[in-house]
UniProtKB/Swiss-Prot annotation:
Molecular function per GO: rRNA binding; structural constituent of ribosome
Subcellular location: Plastid, Chloroplast
Similarity-based family: Belongs to the universal ribosomal protein uL22 family.
Lineage, uppermost ranks: Eukaryota, Rhodophyta, Bangiophyceae, Cyanidiales, Cyanidiaceae
Gene: rpl22
UniProt keyword annotation of Hydrolase present: no
Keyword RNA-binding: yes
Purpose: This protein binds specifically to 23S rRNA.
Main subcellular localisation: plastid
Protein name as catalogued: Large ribosomal subunit protein uL22c
Organism domain of life: Eukaryota
Transmembrane segments: none
UniProtKB keywords: Chloroplast, Plastid, Ribonucleoprotein, Ribosomal protein, RNA-binding, rRNA-binding
Length: 95
């Protein structure tokens, strides 16, 4: 079974930092560990785990993919503009 959280406004690399710690754990262990992680991405992963709890009896496996990037512009000196990429990600949970 696959569960997804899509278009999360966080960089995929920052979310992968949390997901690597939890990959392969049982549901109970992963939900306990994610509560005490000091990263902002842990809240998104915890929400995804919470929505799956009825079906989760085995090990959980996570995947993080890049979603479409929001492109913004930062105004700079002398009428120049620098691009800013606000990255998003999709988190997939497999049981």
């Amino acid at each position: 079974m696959k569960y997804q959280a899509k278009y999360i406004r966080m960089s995929p690399t920052k979310v992968r930092r949390v997901v690597r710690l939890l990959d392969g754990m049982t549901y109970e262990k992963a939900s306990q560990v994610v509560r005490f992680l000091p990263y902002r991405a842990a809240t998104c992963v915890a929400k995804l785990l919470k929505s799956v709890n009825a079906q989760a009896t085995q090990r959980v496996h996570f995947y993080v993919d890049q979603a479409p990037t929001l492109k913004r512009i930062r105004a700079r000196a002398q009428s120049r503009a620098y691009p800013i990429k606000k990255r998003c990600c999709h988190i997939t949970l497999e049981i």
